[in-house]
Curated annotation (Swiss-Prot):
InterPro entries: Dilute_dom, IQ_motif_EF-hand-BS, Kinesin_motor_dom_sf, Myosin_head_motor_dom-like, Myosin_N, P-loop_NTPase. It comes from Dictyostelium discoideum (Social amoeba). Residues 1143-1153 have a biased composition (Basic and acidic residues). This is Myosin-H heavy chain. Residues 1070-1176, 1218-1282, 1312-1343 are annotated as: Disordered. Residues 7-57 form the Myosin N-terminal SH3-like domain. Residues 690-712 are annotated as: Actin-binding. Residues 1112-1139, 1253-1281 have a biased composition (Low complexity).
């Protein structure tokens, strides 16, 4: 298959003088003349074959590296840049060069998220950007340990300065990352400010802009000097350790004479307009208040104030150009920024004032005017009638005198400076004489002084900046650091009129271009050598001849210029004559036809004609020694120091070349010799500094950025083709393309080449299946399909190379146009374009063939369908016709049949009529015959009947006669009568019997009805009685409950009174015995049994009468658990701590236990229960007993009252004893708390009860006689019984054992321990008491210390502060083992430290009745000695703050702390914060706090918030430090598919972040917040990577990303089936939309409705960036994204060009405190992030075992008390 380089009708580029290049169509080839082309206007043009410029394939439009273009020429480059500029893609690669087009608008592509995305990424994967060049330089510096340089060039207004700023911004961020700062998680406000090195490097830019930039016609902020910034980095860490700045060729002529419609340097205008806002004025006002302030400094400020009441129009230097402002720029505001930058650099107020005074003196020097003197060729200073200084004339009665003002500002003599303007001294041998200056020469001397002052000020500023940012020093440069140099210098310039500045600029660019050419050629060589291909014949263009023309000695242009500059009578003509004579034969030098003062140099970018009229003047840098001497003799210290610093710098060899005046400094101090004018050539200085710069650059690895100015109007979205093309030529881009084009610019790896173009040769190999070549191709094709990556083993690469060779042979490509490298194919320019055309044509042909096959298939299918339809239709027609014929036949047969039926009917009718007539006639005949026969028969019968009647008559008559005879006989009559009477009697008897039986049945029925009515009445009565009984039962129960509650109320009141009385007694006894004891511990227990009499004669209340059976049964059951007044029974018991559920509602359950106990029921009751659904009816007798018991309780209350009266009497007796007695009886020691009888609950566990009834009865008796409830209560509340004469030492165990638990609570505990129901376990089914079976043996009672005991232990001996801190230390000391400890509660597990601290300290802060009793030996510090009363709020707040500080010190600062531990402590602080907030809400109306207490509580709240923020940051840092590298590694690993799900989920499973937080239910919001933030972080990271990386923004990468996202969502829902799982997964919605877009047809996105449906979250700007970065896979048949889609998106009203397309990672991990006025971090969207509901009652009911803590705290308190007592004894 032979490739024709111009096959088909192709597009070409046609030259156009206005647009540069326009579209054209290739028509035909004209032999011997070239090609005939038709342009877009329809005009036909002939183009030579060598000048023909082919267009590239559509797939290569807008590509980001123009060396990948198939046709590499100017037209293709311009077209590609235009296409990219239209979609705001301002950066484009040309090989290693980055082309940056000024957009003239702000683009959101320089954010910190963009910096983070470019960090540590290969340049090939990222879109072109200035950050990619910075990243490449930074990584190469660290990886290869070699210095780097970045050369930024371009003409004025192209954006060089802004590009340099972005480079510095990136390097500053990299320096921060080297210091361990995660820049992705800090906001813009958190970026480091101040005087660190990164900030100082960045702040040097506005200073240099103010003093070295000015407004020009081309640029409002044009740099008028070149600069080279070295950023010094640490070799290992990559942190910024310093910087150094060098400047080149300051344009000094702009100081005294700015070009028309341009400005001088910005600082002059900023000073005039912004000095009133200067910080110097504010500082001076503050200094005026200080008595020791310097008066001279204030005088300087006053002078400046008066002199700066002026305008720009008051100064000659500022008004001469006719421009003094910039549109859209406020010089006063810029001045503030400049001054702030100077302050950052470390300049003091005096130095700032000195700068302002020099600037102002320069302006006033410019106002000095001259006029002719009396002598010939002389001049004098013009006084009065000055054209300038109108603002100063009114203030001075003598008129405005600029010379005097300048001298006053500079601190030098007016006479010494005045003489230097109007005359100069000359020496001839030993004689000297004075020569007068003309007016013109005097003006030159004046301007020379101004330029000298400004250039030295500029040089001094550079020195001061270097002193500030050069932290290491030049002496360690070669060993201690690496550097990246940034060169910001003019680009090549070629105007209509080119002067000395353009000559020096172009000379510098020639040198840089020479270095650039060598570098590009070197890179090409390295690439070819790496791939082992032949490159020796590649041509290389060298501009060394042009450089030699300019600088080579002795006849170079610079040498001739310096020579002519030293001759007094030299002119531009003489200069040009020498140039013509020496260089007329040079190919790079030309003489213009019509000018004797111009010459032409053929530079690399084109020919430039220079005008020499100002060459000689601008090359001279005259320094008048008298002026220098006058300045050095100034009495102003700042000015003299300035010259001294510069002199030392110059003599030390480290001077800057700024201003080109460095050489003058060396001679200025010793200028008393030969001439007062010291000649210094600007060109020689520049050449020297340029050579030094080139030496530095050549020692580095250079990178290139070419800034392009798109138009002269400074408008956005305007592209001037011709202007851009000119800049590309001048910047060396076209030359670089020529170098690339001369070699093999198109390069493809073998794998990509085979995948993309295999379809072109597939048909050829298929047609020859049996050949060896085809078999080999098939095997290679399978191998390349199996190995999709670009790499592989050497055998695989060799196999792919063979496949590429087979393809090249099949494609018939000229072997001279192809080179086979080790891993790549190298093609000459145009080959790839032709391959793309062939691929496109093959795809079109294939599509056509597929369409043909498809159309054939569809047509055949349609024909077959039509044929079948036709046959079917014909059959239907035939069927229809046959149906018609059949119907006709049916009708005919039917007609015949009908006719036959009709005829049959007619004949039948006739037959029937005849038949009926015949029959009728026959019947008439028969009737007639029968009638005759009947009549005969009737006559015969009549005769027979008559005979018979006569016979019967005779017989009747005979019978009558016989009857009459019988009637006459009486006997027969009587017998008959009797017979009838007897029959009647029988019947009557039967009737009587039946009547009696009926009456009996009736009576029985009536009796049964009556009985039934009685039963109904009785039933109703019984039901009514039963209801009344139930009501009565309920009333009695209510009455009993009321009586019992009233009893408890009386009981509590009495206990309160007794407690107060006991306290009063204790106080009196302590006063009486206050110095009778030296020990602090009391040993021994006091038993409280029955009514006893103490040594003091106090009698306890008498025993109450025996309780009721119910009470006895309760006491008998509880006796087994209560019997614990002795130590032995307590020590031998088992331990079982009550759970929170057991404690909850104990009082309510105990009250229910009494009411649930019922007596034995009678047999009648049981039987009645069986009849009526077993309804239990309690007898009234039981309630009578309850009433009786209540009366007994009332009697007990009366007894208590008597006991109180006895106590009062005892108090009176004790008071009398205190007054009379000189000795003091023993009392309780201060170590026993005052609330000893309100001690914490002691929890007892499993106790056994025997089944023996006698044992139970014995216990009942013992309960009745010894441990009645009243006696028990009374005994425990009496402190008098504790005052035994043998008191020794009171330990904490004795202290807790002296406490007693209520009987009802013990009964409830008994039921809980034995697993029985208190409501049903008392009685069995028969009403007998139920005895629980248990193992036989002695009862055991073991006591464990709970949280209440810990609270009491902390109060023990009033050492709460020290013991509290000791408790915190105990908790923190074992933090590794405490991580997994959670206290069970109704709210789930509560972290142990938070639970303990909230119960022990936080609760005390909000306890309304909380008081801390201070003993005479207590102190404010919580110790056991001293005086005063402790503030409970202050003490508890201090302990909690101590806890926070301790956790931060031990946990947060420990680098070994893992995420699980951090989450645990995060949960602790979160729980404490929520408990505190709940206390605040519950007690806000009850607490009355003073201002000090409120401040303490607020301080604690802020501390907890701060700790939550710190904990959150530590957790986030731990998570992100692990997950971020996983994501980076997964997305950057080219050897395997993207897989970040498994490492992330494995990590989360290992640290168990969810379990560490979810053990406590109140952490649900916290856990949700962390997971949402984590998934948002993953979403943002991957989303930002996709938007900026070409290798991820494709279909091939979207599939594994989608799979990972789906698996991650599945993991969350599977492991965390919470209601917030969906909200967590929803954080990935933006990423899911992006992945979906990558997998669908992108043309759908042009439709607004479809776009809103596909990606509702994605913004238009983000979508445009996504489509811009998208590129089809190598072997994909998908077309590139049409630029029309991108432009349509940019035209959408929703498109915001200023939008930051990347997601801000720093705003993800934030917290919000709703109920706080403190703003500790930026808020999130959810208002419930840190709020949870806390049930304080449930929390306070939890009893938690803490024996070790209690024992340790008690020991600590005893140690504290002992230590304090020892101290007091010593005192």
């Amino acid at each position: 298959m032979m490739i024709d380089n111009n096959c088909g009708k192709e597009k070409v580029w046609v030259p156009n003088p206005e647009k540069g290049w326009i579209n054209g169509d290739l028509i035909k080839e004209i032999p011997g003349e070239g090609w005939l082309v038709r342009d877009e206007n329809g005009k036909e043009i002939k183009i030579e074959k060598d000048e023909l410029r082919m267009q590239n394939p559509v797939i290569q439009e807008g590509i980001d590296d123009m060396t990948s273009l198939s046709h590499l020429h100017e037209a293709a480059v311009i077209h590609n840049l235009i296409k990219r500029y239209e979609i705001n893609s301002i950066y484009t690669y040309t090989g290693s060069i980055l082309i940056a087009i000024n957009p003239y608008t702000k683009l959101p592509i320089y954010s910190k998220e963009m910096i983070e995305s470019f960090c540590d990424q290969p340049v090939s994967k990222l879109a072109p950007h200035v950050y990619s060049i910075a990243e490449s330089a930074y990584r190469e510096m660290l990886n290869f340990q070699k210095n780097q340089s970045i050369l930024v060039s371009g003409e004025s207004g192209a954006g060089k300065t802004e590009t340099t700023k972005f480079l510095l911004q990136y390097f500053a961020a990299m320096g921060e990352k080297g210091n361990g700062v995660n820049t992705s998680l800090i906001s813009e406000e958190d970026i480091v400010e101040g005087n660190n090195i990164e900030t100082q490097v960045i702040k040097s830019t506005p200073i240099l802009e103010a003093f070295g930039n000015s407004k020009t016609l081309r640029n409002d902020n044009s740099s008028r000097f070149g600069k080279f910034i070295e950023i010094h980095f640490d070799k290992i860490k990559g942190t910024i350790v310093g910087a150094k700045l060098e400047t080149y060729l300051l344009e000094k002529s702009r100081i005294v004479k700015p070009p028309e419609n341009e400005r001088g340097y910005h600082i002059f205008y900023q000073l005039i307009k912004g000095f009133n806002n200067s910080c110097c004025l504010k500082n001076s006002s503050n200094n005026n208040k200080d008595e020791d302030s310097s008066s001279s400094s204030n005088n300087n400020i006053d002078d400046l104030k008066s002199l700066l009441k002026c305008k720009a129009s008051d100064f000659n230097y500022l008004i001469s150009s006719g421009c003094d402002s910039i549109d859209g720029v406020d010089d006063s505001q810029v001045f503030i920024k400049t001054e702030n930058a100077l302050k950052v650099m470390g300049l003091s107020n005096d130095e700032l004032i000195g700068i302002y005074k020099i600037l102002l003196s320069i302006l006033h020097i410019g106002n000095i005017e001259f006029e002719k003197g009396k002598e010939e060729d002389s001049s004098i200073i013009k006084y009065g009638n000055s054209s300038f200084g109108e603002s100063f004339s009114d203030d001075d009665a003598g008129g405005y005198n600029p010379l005097e003002i300048s001298c006053k500002l500079l601190g030098c003599s007016v006479d010494s400076l005045k003489s230097t303007f109007c005359s100069r001294k000359m020496k001839a041998g030993n004689e000297s004489y004075t020569i007068n200056h003309t007016v013109e020469q005097a003006s030159q001397a004046r301007d020379s002084l101004s330029m000298f002052l400004y250039s030295r000020l500029f040089d001094w500023l550079v020195v001061r900046i270097n002193q500030s940012i050069d932290k290491i020093g030049t002496e360690k440069k070669d060993n201690s650091f690496l550097f990246i140099g940034i060169l910001d210098i003019y680009g090549f310039e070629s105007f209509e009129s080119n002067s000395y500045e353009q000559f020096t600029i172009n000379y510098a660019n020639e040198k840089l271009q020479n270095q650039f050419n060598h570098q590009i050629f070197k890179l090409e060589q390295l690439e070819y050598e790496k791939e082992k291909i032949d490159w020796s014949y590649i041509e290389f263009s060298d501009n060394q001849e042009c450089i030699d023309l300019i600088e080579k000695k002795p006849l170079g242009i610079l040498s001739i210029l310096d020579e002519e500059s030293q001759f007094p009578k030299s002119t531009p003509s003489t200069l040009c004559t020498k140039l013509y004579n020496n260089h007329s034969k040079s190919k790079n030098f030309e003489k213009p036809r019509f000018s004797q003062t111009h010459f032409i140099i053929d530079h690399y970018a084109g020919k430039v004609e220079y005008d020499t009229n100002l060459f000689l003047e601008k090359n001279k840098d005259f320094i008048i020694s008298e002026q220098v001497s006058a300045l050095e003799s100034s009495n102003w210290k700042f000015l003299t120091n300035l010259f001294q610093i510069l002199s030392k710098k110059m003599n030390g060899g480290g001077g800057t070349s700024g201003g080109g005046g460095a050489g003058g400094n060396k001679a200025s101090s010793s200028a008393a010799g030969k001439s007062t004018f010291k000649f210094t050539s600007v060109s020689s200085q520049f050449k020297e500094s340029l050579n030094s710069l080139m030496t530095t650059i050549n020692s580095t690895n250079p990178h290139y950025i070419r800034c392009i100015k798109p138009n002269t109007e400074k408008r956005a979205n305007l592209f001037d083709n011709v202007m851009v093309l000119h800049q590309l030529r001048c910047s060396g881009v076209i030359e670089q393309l020529r170098i690339s084009r001369s070699g093999y610019p198109s390069r493809l790896v073998y794998d990509n080449f085979i995948k993309r173009y295999k379809l072109i040769v597939a048909k050829d190999f298929k047609n020859d299946d049996d050949s060896n070549e085809s078999k080999e191709w098939n095997s290679i094709l399978k191998e390349t399909d199996l190995n999709s990556s670009n790499g592989g083993t050497n055998n695989q690469i060799e196999l792919k190379r063979k496949g590429a060779e087979l393809m090249i042979n099949k494609l018939s490509i000229d072997i001279s146009s192809v080179q086979f490298g080790l891993t790549k194919l190298f093609f000459k320019s145009g080959i790839i374009a032709n391959l793309e055309l062939l691929r496109s044509q093959t795809m079109i042909n294939s599509a056509t063939f597929i369409q043909k096959i498809w159309r054939g298939y569809t047509d055949r299918k349609a024909y077959t369908s039509t044929k079948h339809s036709s046959i079917y239709f014909q059959s239907l027609i035939r069927s229809y016709l046959q149906q018609l014929e059949y119907n006709s036949m049916v009708e005919e047969n039917s007609a015949i049949h009908l006719q036959s039926l009709i005829r049959t009917n007619e004949l039948e009718k006739q037959f029937n009529q005849l038949l009926s007539t015949t029959i009728h006639f026959q019947s008439l005949l028969r009737r007639l015959e029968d009638s005759k026969e009947f009549n005969t028969l009737m006559d015969r019968i009549k005769k027979i009947v008559k005979i018979q009647s006569l016979w019967r008559s005779n017989l009747a008559k005979k019978q009558l006669k016989l009857l009459k005879a019988e009637a006459k006989s009486l006997t027969n009559v009587v017998a008959e009568k009797n017979k009838l009477a007897s029959k009647l009697g029988d019947i009557q008897s039967k009737l009587d019997m039946e009547s009696q039986l009926a009456q009996k049945i009736k009576n029985e029925n009536e009796q049964l009805s009556s009985q039934f009515s009685n039963i109904q009445i009785e039933k109703e009565k019984l039901q009514k009685d039963f209801g009344n009984i139930n009501l009565e039962k309920e009333e009695l129960l209510l009455k009993y409950s009321a009586l019992e509650s009233e009893y408890h109320q009386y009981k509590q009141q009495n206990e309160l009174i007794i407690s107060k009385l006991k306290q009063h007694i204790n106080d009196l006894e302590e006063k009486q015995h206050q110095h009778s004891y030296k020990n602090n511990e009391v040993v021994g227990n006091t038993s409280f049994e029955g009514s006893t009499t103490t040594n003091n004669g106090v009698t306890s209340p008498p025993k109450s009468s025996p309780a009721s059976p119910i009470r006895n049964s309760i006491n008998s059951n509880s006796d087994t658990t209560i019997s614990g007044s002795s130590d032995d029974s307590i020590d031998n018991t088992d331990s079982l701590i009550l759970s929170p559920k057991q404690h909850k509602g104990e009082d309510r359950k105990r009250n229910h236990e009494i009411s649930s106990i019922s007596p034995p029921r009678s047999r009648e009751t049981i039987g009645h229960d069986d009849d009526d659904n077993n309804v239990d009816v309690i007898p009234r007798r039981q309630f009578n007993e309850l009433e009786k018991e209540y009366k007994e309780l009332k009697q007990m209350d009366e007894t208590h009252k008597q006991y109180i009266e006895s106590l009062k009497l005892q108090i009176t007796q004790l008071e009398e004893k205190v007054k009379k007695s000189s000795s003091h009886p023993r009392s309780l020691l201060p170590g026993i708390p005052s609330n000893i009888n309100d001690s914490p609950k002691v929890v007892y566990t499993k106790s056994s009860i025997t089944n023996d009834n006698s044992s139970s009865h014995h216990q009942q008796q013992q309960q009745q006689h010894n441990i009645s409830p009243s006696n028990s209560i009374t005994s425990t509340t009496s402190p008098i019984n504790m005052m035994d004469s043998n008191i020794k030492s009171l330990s904490y165990k004795d202290f807790t054992n002296s406490q007693e638990i209520d009987a009802q609570q013990q009964l409830h505990q008994y039921h809980l321990n034995n697993g029985t129901n208190p409501a049903t376990s008392t009685t069995n089914g028969s009403g007998n008491p139920l005895s629980q079976s248990s193992p036989t043996g002695s009862d055991k009672h073991i006591q464990q210390s709970t949280i209440s005991d810990l609270v009491s232990a902390l109060n023990f001996n009033n050492c709460q502060l020290e013991s509290g801190k000791y408790l915190v230390d105990l908790i923190i000391k074992n933090h590794d083992s405490i991580v997994s400890k959670y206290v069970p509660s109704e709210m789930g597990g509560i972290p142990e430290p938070a639970f303990i601290l909230s119960r022990c300290f936080l609760k005390n802060i909000y306890d309304v009745d909380a008081t801390v009793i201070g003993t005479p030996n207590s102190t404010n510090s919580g110790g056991g000695s001293g005086t005063g009363v402790l503030d409970p709020i202050e003490t508890n707040v201090n302990i909690l703050i101590y806890f926070c500080d301790k956790v931060e010190e031990v946990i947060y600062r420990d680098p070994k702390s893992n995420c699980s531990a951090l989450c645990y402590w995060f949960s602790n602080f979160y729980t404490l914060f929520n408990i505190m907030e709940t206390y605040n809400q519950d007690t806000k109306d009850q607490l009355s706090l003073n201002d000090q207490d409120k401040a303490l509580i607020e301080k604690l709240k802020i501390t907890l918030q701060t700790m939550i923020v710190k904990a959150h940051k530590n957790v986030v840092k731990n998570i992100t430090d692990y997950i971020q590298p996983i994501l980076h590694k997964s997305l950057n690993d080219t050897t395997s598919e993207i897989d970040f799900m498994d490492p992330i989920t494995n990590y989360l499973n290992q640290i168990q972040i969810s379990l560490s937080l979810e053990n406590c239910y109140i952490n649900n919001n916290l856990c949700k917040l962390l997971f949402e933030q984590l998934f948002s972080f993953i979403n943002a990271m991957i989303f930002n990577e996709i938007l900026l990386r070409k290798d991820l923004c494709c279909l091939r990468s979207s599939i594994p990303i989608k799979m990972n996202i789906s698996e991650l969502e599945h993991w969350v829902k599977l492991h965390h089936g919470k209601e917030w799982s969906s909200s967590v997964c929803d954080k990935l919605r933006l990423l899911k939309e992006v992945v979906y877009i990558l997998m669908i047809d992108k043309t759908q996105l042009q439709n607004d409705e479809l776009r809103d449906e596909i990606c509702p979250t994605l913004s238009i700007a983000q979508l445009k960036q996504l489509l811009t970065m998208y590129s089809p896979d190598v072997d994909s048949f998908e077309d590139p994204i049409p630029l029309e889609i991108l432009t349509s998106l940019m035209d959408s009203p929703k498109y915001n060009p200023d939008e930051n397309i990347l997601l801000d990672l720093s705003k993800i991990f934030t917290l919000k405190f709703i109920n706080s006025n403190q703003t500790l971090s930026s808020s999130t969207s959810s208002e419930n992030d840190l709020m949870a509901t806390i049930n304080l009652n449930a929390l306070e009911s939890v009893q938690y075992a803490c024996d070790d803590l209690v024992s340790n705290i008690v020991k600590k308190n005893i140690e504290i008390v002992s230590l304090n007592n020892q101290k007091s004894i010593k005192k």
